[in-house]
């Protein structure tokens, strides 16, 4: 059996990140490959480091000992408790390689494979310090290895010429490129290469298969709010929508401080329990790409509230299914 090793942003405490990684692994197995996830976890994405690293960058919270204490009290449950919970889910469901945190120091841990692949999600966008990470462009793979991209994303649609020039260099070793958004096709074309647009892996995997992963829940008659970006107008809209529909409002999140916002709070559900809440909702209100994707797959009524930034992927999936009226 041939082996494929793929890299994606699987280690973020985020439902979409986990579920698209799981779907990619399963799809490659369907295609007859032994699929392995490169367990590349950047230092700034390790759950036990995130709180302190973000605090160092925050002018608002890094002012004095008291503001730093408040920040740690509020953020630590999100990053540590939910981080550990997601790590257990990854260990249970994903075929992970040895952990790699430094591509130079850990070079001997790079798996041998027949094909190396950049997976889905926002792998080709600016990740830290407003720059891209070469690891997600397969910089770790042998020079003569076969390299592909599977539903990759840049996260946004416009980049300056200097960044396009950098993409031209980073994409030069790929044998085949598929991307998630129509705007990503344009970026790859500007860099001088061909790309084909395909669906996100979660959608290729399909609603029927996801339904087999659902877990029992007891909640009924609710509007589900899945919100990634702070937006008071969205909070108020969700509250009024649920009241008008005569339904209770449930909020799912991996951020404990969201317990102070509208809706009955569900903290850090397992990924498949999260899907169960979407599948059983009367309505869903979301600003999340993957929230939208699963609402479509489970044939749920939903309202899309576009985030202020990085709206390309949300718009793209709505356009693909002719659902722009859900905005």
Task: Put a short name on every predicted segment.
Residues 2, 112, 141-144, 210-222:
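Nucleotide-sugar donor-binding and catalytic loop/hinge architecture
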Residues 6-15, 19-169:
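Aromatic- and Gly/Pro-rich donor/ligand-binding loops
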Residues 146-156, 184-188, 227-228, 233-270:
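Catalytic donor nucleotide-activated moiety binding site of glycosyltransferases and closely related
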Residues 157-162, 203-216:
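Acidic anion/phosphate-binding donor-loop and adjacent secondary structure
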Residues 174-181, 285:
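A short beta-strand/loop micro-motif in the catalytic core of glycosyltransferases
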Residues 195-203, 207, 254-287, 292:
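Donor nucleotide-activated moiety binding/catalytic core segment of transferases
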Residues 277-317:
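A donor-sugar binding/catalytic signature common to diverse glycosyltransferases
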Residues 320-327:
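Leloir-type glycosyltransferase catalytic cores
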């Amino acid at each position: 059996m041939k082996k494929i090793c793929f890299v994606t942003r699987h280690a973020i405490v985020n439902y979409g990140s986990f579920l698209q990684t799981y779907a990619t692994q399963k799809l490659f197995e369907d295609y007859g490959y032994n699929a392995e996830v490169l367990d590349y976890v950047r230092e700034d994405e390790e759950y036990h480091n995130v709180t302190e690293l973000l605090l160092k960058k925050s002018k608002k919270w890094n002012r004095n000992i008291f503001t730093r204490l408040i920040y740690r009290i509020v953020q630590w449950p999100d990053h540590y408790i939910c981080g550990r919970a997601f790590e257990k889910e990854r260990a249970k469901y994903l075929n992970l390689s040895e952990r790699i945190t430094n591509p130079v120091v850990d070079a001997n841990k790079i798996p041998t494979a027949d094909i190396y692949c950049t997976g889905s999600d926002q792998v080709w966008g600016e990740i830290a310090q407003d720059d891209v990470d070469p690891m997600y462009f397969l910089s770790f793979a042998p020079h003569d290895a076969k390299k592909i991209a599977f539903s990759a994303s840049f996260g946004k649609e416009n980049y300056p010429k200097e960044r396009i020039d950098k993409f031209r260099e980073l994409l030069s070793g790929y044998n085949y490129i598929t991307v998630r958004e129509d705007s990503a096709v344009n970026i790859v074309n500007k860099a001088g290469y061909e790309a084909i647009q395909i669906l996100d892996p979660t959608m290729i995997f399909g609603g029927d298969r996801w339904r087999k992963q659902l877990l029992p829940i007891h909640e009924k008659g609710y509007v589900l709010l899945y919100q990634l970006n702070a937006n008071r107008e969205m909070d108020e809209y969700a509250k009024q929508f649920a009241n008008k529909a005569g339904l209770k409002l449930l909020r799912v999140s991996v951020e404990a401080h969201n317990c102070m916002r509208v809706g009955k709070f569900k903290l850090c559900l397992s990924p498949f329990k999260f899907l169960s809440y979407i599948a059983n909702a009367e309505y869903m209100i979301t600003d999340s790409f993957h929230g939208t994707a699963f609402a479509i797959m489970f044939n749920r009524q939903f309202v899309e509230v576009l985030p202020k930034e990085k709206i390309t992927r949300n718009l793209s999936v709505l356009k693909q299914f002719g659902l722009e009226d859900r905005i």
